[in-house]
Amino acid sequence: MTGVQTCALPISPLEYFRGKARLERSLADTGISHAILRPTVLFGKEDILINNIAWALRRLPVFGVFGTGKYRLQPIYVDDLAALAVEQGGKHDNVTINATGPETFTYRDLVKCIGQSIGKKKPMISIPPSIGYLAAWFLGKCVGDVMITRDEIKGLMSDLLYVDSPPTGTTRLTDWITEHADTLGRTYTSELARRIDRNKGY
């Protein structure tokens, strides 16, 4: 069983998605029974993306959005993904499943939802991807992290985190954000630190 992002394309111009496609192909070539789960954005305890959007909203006077911000995401709760993995682990069918949550957001609407829930609604401005990358690079230096890569920006803006299929998760991100509004974004969560220190919690 393997977990990969929603879009794994062998001919993608983005190395990340080509790598995921190679992984899927290698797994299929083994001949063993397998389930390939393709989650989009994850949320849950010690979340990175949702938490760090909230962190930025708590501290910055405005929030920059790459381009129009109309590209879509289907966040899935980490416990829903885990339950799906356990369920498929007990089966012997070869399947590929798009693991998505019950809600679809544009990126702009996601930021707006988080801001409203934590009481930090901020003006959103559209910025060119190149400027957004430089701004994220500078902020990343301040917090000792790589906040986003150029390929991640391209994948996000290409709508690669959206797929037209029924949701597999049942937990709504809007409900989860409301339940955790008091603590969300109080501290920055470093993905780089977690990769370096494997003892850090996820």
Model-assigned labels for residue ranges:
Residues T2-L9:
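Short, small-residue-biased leader/transition segments that mark boundaries at the very start
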Residues I11-K120:
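Oxidoreductase cofactor-interface core, primarily capturing Rossmann-like NAD(P)-dependent enzymes
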Residues P61-I76, L139-L160:
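Low-complexity, charge- and small-residue-enriched intrinsically disordered regions
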Residues A85-T149, D159-Y202:
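Mid/C-terminal beta-alpha module of Rossmann-like enzyme folds, strongest
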